[in-house]
From Swiss-Prot:
<feature type="binding site">
    <location>
        <position position="176"/>
    </location>
    <ligand>
        <name>Mg(2+)</name>
    </ligand>
</feature>
<feature type="domain" description="Obg">
    <location>
        <begin position="4"/>
        <end position="162"/>
    </location>
</feature>
<dbReference type="GO" id="GO:0042254">
    <property type="term" value="P:ribosome biogenesis"/>
</dbReference>
<dbReference type="InterPro" id="IPR006074">
    <property type="entry name" value="GTP1-OBG_CS"/>
</dbReference>
<feature type="binding site">
    <location>
        <begin position="313"/>
        <end position="315"/>
    </location>
    <ligand>
        <name>GTP</name>
    </ligand>
</feature>
<feature type="binding site">
    <location>
        <position position="196"/>
    </location>
    <ligand>
        <name>Mg(2+)</name>
    </ligand>
</feature>
<keyword id="KW-0963">Cytoplasm</keyword>
<feature type="binding site">
    <location>
        <begin position="169"/>
        <end position="176"/>
    </location>
    <ligand>
        <name>GTP</name>
    </ligand>
</feature>
<comment type="subunit">
    <text>Monomer.</text>
</comment>
<feature type="binding site">
    <location>
        <begin position="216"/>
        <end position="219"/>
    </location>
    <ligand>
        <name>GTP</name>
    </ligand>
</feature>
<dbReference type="InterPro" id="IPR031167">
    <property type="entry name" value="G_OBG"/>
</dbReference>
<dbReference type="GO" id="GO:0003924">
    <property type="term" value="F:GTPase activity"/>
</dbReference>
<feature type="binding site">
    <location>
        <begin position="194"/>
        <end position="198"/>
    </location>
    <ligand>
        <name>GTP</name>
    </ligand>
</feature>
<comment type="function">
    <text>An essential GTPase which binds GTP, GDP and possibly (p)ppGpp with moderate affinity, with high nucleotide exchange rates and a fairly low GTP hydrolysis rate. Plays a role in control of the cell cycle, stress response, ribosome biogenesis and in those bacteria that undergo differentiation, in morphogenesis control.</text>
</comment>
<dbReference type="InterPro" id="IPR014100">
    <property type="entry name" value="GTP-bd_Obg/CgtA"/>
</dbReference>
<dbReference type="Pfam" id="PF01018">
    <property type="entry name" value="GTP1_OBG"/>
</dbReference>
<keyword id="KW-0479">Metal-binding</keyword>
Length: 333
């Protein structure tokens, strides 16, 4: 998916370098009529690496870099000198990048740590020079190995945002507003559905200089698990969150029904979603007086016996400190 500079899915072609040829050189020196073999080995072909970079949040820099090629190994020389190794290529990617084989869809590996370096395409081995093939019956071999070819492959890079808490809700539930008041993030906010078309990340500053990361996942609609709307693109990012915050506005006609739809979509996409910690947050509660809040709590106590809930107002900034405390506790239990 792409919006502006945010890209979380790219297809690229990579090729590692081929190995250099071994040398068939025979030693030549004044007054030595028959010098033996001294051909060196070819250098290895360059590798293509993926490297994790915590400073990256998008695959945008690879959107137009469709062909990435490492260098070829140099040929072996005389005096058993080895050819130079081919130039390696390093592709920096955000943490949470999953690498898939384009043809089979097989997950090859994923990058989750800063500085983590994995070989995507290994360079071809350099060929052995004729020096290796000398023997009592063939003292001047004129054969050397060719270098092995490099590896060519089409791969898919898919970014799954890494965050501690994922904000889950229907479009226009107020997730972006909540993110903006909890963190210093500045997501696009407007009073219409699907304002957010990309995951927005923010860092919540907590007590004693501690912090955690919260992600505003684009709004989910019924049928998202079947790909309705942009469902699969959105749901992919929720897989990495350890805690899910379900945000439902207090003016929703049926809070329980809306929550059940959200849970159902997540479960259909990946049943393991049910294993995550969940917190229900009812927003826009500054619209209620104390009596209505008491009535709402009584209803929620019946409908959500096993799921913790909280009442907040992002605009009036009510209940936000308690919300931070609750999330921190859930993340560190």
């Amino acid at each position: 998916m792409t919006e502006g500079n945010f890209v979380d899915y790219v297809k690229i072609y990579v090729s590692s370098g081929k190995g250099g040829k071994g040398s068939t050189h025979l030693h030549r020196e004044k007054f030595i009529e028959k010098g033996g073999p001294d051909g060196g080995d070819g250098g290895r072909g360059g590798h293509v690496y993926l490297v994790g970079n915590k400073g990256l949040w998008t695959l945008f820099h690879l959107k137009f870099a469709r062909h990435i090629k490492a260098g070829h190994g140099g040929d072996g020389g005389s005096d058993r000198s080895t050819g130079a190794d081919g130039e390696d290529k390093f592709i920096e990617v955000p943490l949470g990048t999953v690498v898939k084989d384009k043809e089979t869809g097989e997950v090859l590996f994923e990058i989750t740590e800063d500085g983590e370096k994995r070989i995507l395409a290994k360079g071809g081995k350099g060929g052995l020079g004729n020096w290796h093939f000398r023997s009592s019956t063939n003292q001047t071999p004129r054969y050397a190995q060719p270098g092995l070819p490099g590896l060519e492959m089409d791969v898919i890079l898919e970014l799954k945002v890494l965050a501690d808490v994922g904000l889950v809700g229907f479009p226009n539930a107020g997730k972006s507003t909540l993110l903006s008041v909890l963190t210093s993030a500045k997501p696009k906010i407007a009073d219409y559905p699907f304002t957010t078309l990309k995951p927005n990340l923010g860092i919540v500053a907590y007590r004693d200089f501690q912090s955690f990361v919260i992600a505003d996942i684009p709004g989910i609609i019924e049928g998202a698990a079947e790909g309705k709307g942009l469902g699969h693109y959105f749901l992919r990012h929720i897989e990495r969150n350890s805690t899910l915050l379900f945000l439902v506005p207090v003016d929703t006609p049926d809070i329980k029904a809306e929550y059940d739809i959200l849970v159902n979509e997540l479960t259909k996409y990946n049943p393991e979603m049910l294993d995550k910690e969940r917190l229900l947050v009812i927003s826009k509660c500054d619209m209620l007086d104390d009596e209505l809040k008491a009535e709402l709590k009584a209803e929620l106590d019946v409908s959500f016996k096993d799921i913790p809930y909280m009442l907040i107002s992002s605009v009036a900034q009510q209940g936000l400190t308690d919300l931070k405390d609750k999330l921190w506790k859930m993340l560190n239990e």
